[in-house]
A protein has these predicted regions:
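Iron-sulfur-associated redox domains of electron-transfer enzymes in respiratory
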Residues: 2, 7-8, 15-88, 92, ...
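Extended, non-catalytic structural segments that build the interaction scaffolds
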Residues: 12-14, 151
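Unusually extended, aromatic-enriched hydrophobic runs near protein termini
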Residues: 151-154, 159-162, 172, 180-212, ...
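Structural motif corresponding to the C-terminal cap of alpha-helices
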Residues: 169, 208, 344-348
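Fe-S ferredoxin-like electron-transfer domains
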Residues: 51-200, 206, 213-228, 232
């Protein structure tokens, strides 16, 4: 790969050498200079909408007209940039104050209090008064969908959600509607989110800098169930939750806090605390046997995983011809709920109608999944309520539990035991690897060696591999693929339909990188997202 040409740029008196395709914003960060942004997301939303990243710039000794935005201004050799002048500071503060003039300022009770990027910028820029007042945009509060809530009074028109939905997922549920003071971000034609093709993945929530889009909270319902003496409340936690929950309490990003999480759940009042890995193992076993049966009996191939509810909804809406390819397995969340209200209820002598099953998931689409009409038996919902990782953190804080002081605890027995296979479900490729290991063990009685995946040129977030397994009395080269993000999945499905890609088994995760980047995980600022 050819080395990119470097250019010399001076920013606030600091000389830095960067690739010629860099923007001034990226060059400034290389030089250790933080330029404020609200709308910017690298490679996703580079539209200069907020105008908080303005600067003064000179090229060949000639000042550029007006104040260009550094997020889209390309560097040039010898360019001189200033972001610390009085003119720039005044412009940034005024633009920030204009954004605030059209913003709902209920910061103390807002769900994004202390994680709001707008709030942080106001603090950093010393905004302590409201200088502008006037006509504001019309109010739209949409809480009709089972998973996502929109609040237009908090929208800053940054466009991040529009770009994420279009570029990461290629669905484009959200768009800019109307003009001038009436401009808003919303589904077209005045539709509610629930009346669109939204898959409830929550990537729009992940990128929103404020609280204009958030998950539909189940916190009150869960508290009510815990306080009801007639209800036996059980909770399951997904693998990706333990790796992210600690971030809400100052723990290093990515560090697992399994023991403290279990301890916190018990203190919250849940009667039993279980691990979704238990049902993940069940899913792996069922999926593995189903795959063997399909290959032996010339069933529909490639078999495609059914763990990701966002992916399932996408398939149903956009690619119904692939529905026969989907595994017949319920997701681990729903499988756990079904087992909890049958096997567990019988084992413990509890009437299923008195069991409330709560899930803690990294995923907003799980809220929509548990509400699907078919996810019940004899009138009993498999899963009653779903909490995101963020919601669990709020409950822990509300209960005044000091997370860092908690002792380590283990999940309850009966459905608290599991193998290591389910643990890797949270990362892309985890479901596939676990299922293949099960298939290999069933067919050969031996452990499968590491699966060596190779990236596929032209499709981001997609990799494939091949494994030789004895199926139906002969060695079969099983071709498998792993894809995350709906935009990438669409390319893979099109390649399969066109006969350009032959696979036996395909894992699809709706969120880029898998469940660890789900729509219910702790908020990460755009700057930290870039750094990580």
């Amino acid at each position: 790969m050819a080395t990119k040409k470097k250019v010399n740029v001076t920013i606030n008196g600091v000389q830095v050498q960067v690739p010629e395709d860099y923007t001034v914003l990226l060059a400034a960060r290389e030089a250790g200079i933080d330029i404020p942004t609200l709308c910017y997301l690298k490679d996703i939303n580079e539209v200069a909408a907020c105008r908080l990243c303005v600067c003064e710039a000179e090229v060949n000794g000639k000042p550029m007209r007006n104040l260009p935005t550094s997020c889209v201004l390309k560097v040039e050799d010898g360019m001189v940039v200033r972001t610390d002048t009085e003119r720039v500071r005044k412009a940034v503060k005024m633009n920030l104050e204009l954004i605030l003039a059209n913003h709902n300022r209920e910061c103390l009770t807002c769900t994004r209090n202390q994680t709001c990027e707008l709030q942080k910028l106001c603090h950093e820029m010393g905004i302590d008064m409201e200088w502008f007042d006037g006509e504001t945009r019309s109010v739209c509060y949409d809480d009709l969908s089972p998973a996502i809530v929109r609040d237009s009074t908090k929208c800053v028109l940054c466009g991040r959600c529009v770009s994420a939905c279009a570029k990461l997922q290629n669905i484009s549920v959200l768009e800019f509607v109307n003009r001038g003071v009436n401009t808003k971000v919303a589904p077209g034609f005045g539709y509610s989110i629930k009346d669109t093709d939204c898959i409830y993945c929550g990537q729009c929530i992940n990128v929103c800098p404020v609280a204009a889009i958030k998950e539909k909270s189940h916190i009150k319902q869960v508290w009510d169930a815990i306080q009801d003496p007639k209800k036996h409340v059980v909770v399951q936690t997904a693998p990706a939750v333990r790796a992210a929950l600690g971030e809400e309490f100052g723990v290093t990003m990515g560090k697992a806090v399994t023991g403290k999480m279990v301890s916190a759940l018990k203190r919250l009042g849940f009667d039993k605390v279980f691990d979704t890995n238990f049902s993940a193992d069940l899913t792996i076993m069922e999926e593995g046997y189903e795959f063997i049966n399909r290959v032996k009996n010339k069933g529909t191939l490639p078999m495609i995983t059914s763990c990701s509810p966002g992916w399932i909804r996408y398939c149903e809406v956009f690619y119904p011809e692939f529905i026969p390819n989907l595994s017949t397995c319920k997701s681990p969340q729903q499988m756990f709920g079904a087992v909890a209200k049958s096997y567990y209820a019988k084992k413990e002598g509890i009437n299923p109608k008195n069991i409330v099953c709560v899930s803690v998931m990294p995923c907003t689409a799980k809220k929509a999944e548990c509400a699907r009409p078919e996810m019940q038996v004899d009138g009993h919902r498999d899963v009653d309520y779903v909490l995101t990782t963020r919601e669990l953190a709020k409950m822990i804080n509300e209960a005044r539990i000091m997370f860092d002081k908690l002792p380590e605890a283990d999940p309850d027995p009966i459905m608290g035991e599991y193998t290591g296979a389910g643990v890797i479900f949270g990362a892309t490729g985890g479901v596939m690897e676990a299922a293949l290991r099960t298939v290999a063990d069933v067919l050969t009685g031996k452990d499968l060696k590491d699966v060596d995946y190779e990236a596929v040129r032209g499709i981001d977030f997609f990799k494939q591999a091949s494994v030789t397994l004895p199926i139906g009395g002969k060695d079969v080269e099983v071709k498998v693929g792993v894809v995350s993000s709906i935009a990438a999945a669409e390319k893979v499905l099109n390649a399969i339909a066109a006969g350009e890609l032959q696979l036996h088994f395909l894992e699809v995760m709706a969120c880029p990188g898998g469940c660890v980047h789900g729509g219910g995980q702790p908020h990460v600022s755009a700057k930290n997202r870039l750094d990580k």
